[in-house]
Amino acid sequence: MGRRKIKMEMVQDMNTRQVTFSKRRTGLFKKASELATLCNAELGIVVFSPGGKPFSYGKPNLDSVAERFMREYDDSDSGDEEKSGNYRPKLKRLSERLDLLNQEVEAEKERGEKSQEKLESAGDERFKESIETLTLDELNEYKDRLQTVHGRIEGQVNHLQASSCLMLLSRK
């Protein structure tokens, strides 16, 4: 039996509303945690229960996220940023950051192309040898080398994903 689609309207029964709030709050905080982990983002969420009790989640913590928000956007709340020119230094910093990230991406692309050329020129001889003829020690050594390569690949993927998230955030 599959899940039913629930209409988006306020739940009338107070007990059901409280249960729904608790479950959805947990899901919201879980998604926020995943976003923070995947994109190396700092984030903060504050929600109030139907009874008026506040719940918060912050990564790394809500205080540091709120402090950073207030520090960076304190001047922009006045609505006079175009007149005062306060947006220009921020825009310049973001533009410089974007340029640096673009340079990193280009460097990584070049590194990837060079690595690809090395792999193609090597002819994948390492992977052609028959593993049936290897001793237990040789197999363990081979396994360790593969795990090392796998770890480096995962690290590079995580670095590129974080850079991509930063680029997307800096464009907004």
UniProtKB/Swiss-Prot annotation:
Gene3D superfamilies: Transcription factor, MADS-box
Tissue expression notes: Expressed in pollen.
GO function terms (MF aspect): DNA binding; DNA-binding transcription factor activity; protein dimerization activity
InterPro entries cross-referenced by the UniProt entry: TF_MADSbox, TF_MADSbox_sf
Primary localization: nucleus
Database matches in PROSITE patterns: MADS_BOX_2
Cystine connections: none
Domain of life: Eukaryota
Keyword Transcription regulation applies: yes
Subcellular compartments: Nucleus
Region (Disordered) residue spans: 106-125
Protein name: Agamous-like MADS-box protein AGL29
